[in-house]
A protein has these predicted regions:
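Non-catalytic pre-domain segments flanking phosphatase-related domains
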Residues: 1-13, 32, 39
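Mg2+-dependent phosphoryl-transfer enzymes with acidic/Ser/Thr/Gly-rich catalytic loops
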Residues: 2-10, 26-27, 183, 198-283
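Short, acidic loop-to-helix structural element flanking the phosphoryl-transfer center
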Residues: 24-40, 87-94, 146-151, 202-216, ...
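Conserved acidic, metal-coordinating active-site core of Asp-based
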Residues: 101, 105-107, 112-228
Length: 283
């Protein structure tokens, strides 16, 4: 591990592929490391593409969780007061336009609005055909409310959208199509978090900008933040943090941008890396 000089007062943690195991579980080793760092005064901040209620109970119930960066940075919230510290959403009309274009592609899609997921009923029923990972499929089915037709639902509610997510049939198709998707929606933040999914957010909804906003709120220099991630939606915070740490199982672009590499998410990678920092007095 490289030598580091700064004490880290805020730890931003991606969940899927980073803090959680491939089975979407929080290990006891990772839990102990988080509580130990919190005991020394560090802010422990889940930083995820999920909305808060979509996080595993084992994470949500940690006594050290006050702040959360959710939906890829579309929202930063003080969970103690309920105050939303940062918000960046896709305007209602633009979200509908995006979905009209997605209707021409071989994908299923959904959206997050007001901290919950919504999906057209017929697309919801196709989930098992597009999502082979049983843990991801379970998350999709449990955290989406089927509606007769999503675009009509958005027109009716008039609400802005926190995130649009869609799935290609295969990972290979997603890799091939991602540059095309980024060119198709140049005014939006288009990235991939896992497997065969693509996620679309407002331009200001990214984990890096959200991390900076939270640091400003807390009066901390961003140089005193530590960020762990694995996916392309983590790249902005890996680059923004005082120290960005990529998981061994991470995307090559994320690993190339990181200041250090932690063991994989299936090997208590976050906890093991944090234990070293704790031993060095850097947390």
């Amino acid at each position: 591990m490289p030598e580091f000089e700064l004490p880290y007062r805020l730890i931003a943690l991606d969940l899927d592929g980073t803090l959680l195991t491939p089975q979407k579980e929080l290990t006891e080793g990772n839990r102990r490391a988080l509580l130990a760092a919190a005991g020394r005064g560090a802010h422990i901040v889940p930083t995820t593409g999920r909305f808060f209620e979509g996080m595993p109970e084992a994470v949500r119930s940690l006594p050290c969780i006050r702040y959360a960066i959710t939906i890829n940075g579309a929202q930063v919230q003080d969970r103690q007061t309920g105050e939303v510290l940062y918000r960046a959403e896709i305007p209602n009309r633009r979200a509908i336009e995006v979905m009209e274009q997605l209707d021409t592609l071989p994908v299923i899609y959904d959206c997050y609005m007001d901290n919950w997921g919504y999906m057209t009923e017929t697309l919801y029923a196709q989930g098992p055909a597009y999502i082979q990972d049983p843990h991801v499929l379970k998350m999709l089915l449990e955290l989406r409310k089927p509606v007769p037709e999503l675009k009509a639902f958005l027109r009716e509610t008039g609400r802005d959208v926190q995130k649009i997510q869609f799935f290609f049939p295969t990972v290979e198709e997603r890799i091939r199509r991602l540059p095309q998707m980024q060119a198709l929606f140049p005014d939006l933040n288009v990235c991939s978090a896992l497997g065969n999914n693509v996620e679309i957010n407002a331009p200001a909804a990214n984990k890096g900008d959200a991390l900076k906003a939270l640091c400003r709120h807390l009066g901390l220099p961003v140089s005193q933040s530590l960020a762990f991630g694995d996916g392309l939606n983590d790249l902005s915070m890996i680059q923004a943090a005082g120290l960005g740490v990529a998981m061994e199982n991470g995307d090559p672009a994320v690993k190339a941008a990181a200041g250090a590499i932690a063991p994989s998410c299936g090997e208590d990678g976050v906890g093991r890396f944090m234990e070293t920092l704790l031993e060095q007095g850097l947390l």
